[in-house]
Amino acid sequence: MKKVEIKKKTIKELNIELMNLLREQFNLTLQHSAKKLQQSHLLQHVRRNIAQVNTILAEKEKECD
């Protein structure tokens, strides 16, 4: 996901996106631990997306204060 796309979203949408990413990370971690994950790089992508969403979310919350 591009940063421009993330910045256009509202705080509510960002929270929903964050929950979806965390759920996806959990599922990928389970698959990885069971040795069923063929594309282990997906974990890194999801982790990066979580960090980006958290950063933008913090910026938007700071703006509201």
UniProtKB/Swiss-Prot annotation:
Q: Mind telling me what this protein is named?
A: Large ribosomal subunit protein uL29
**PANTHER family per the record?**
60S RIBOSOMAL PROTEIN L35/50S RIBOSOMAL PROTEIN L29, LARGE RIBOSOMAL SUBUNIT PROTEIN UL29C
Is Oxidoreductase among this UniProt entry's keywords? no
Return one GO MF term: structural constituent of ribosome
Q: Which Pfam families match?
A: Ribosomal_L29
Q: Which domain of life is it from?
A: Bacteria
User: One biological-process term from Gene Ontology?
Assistant: translation
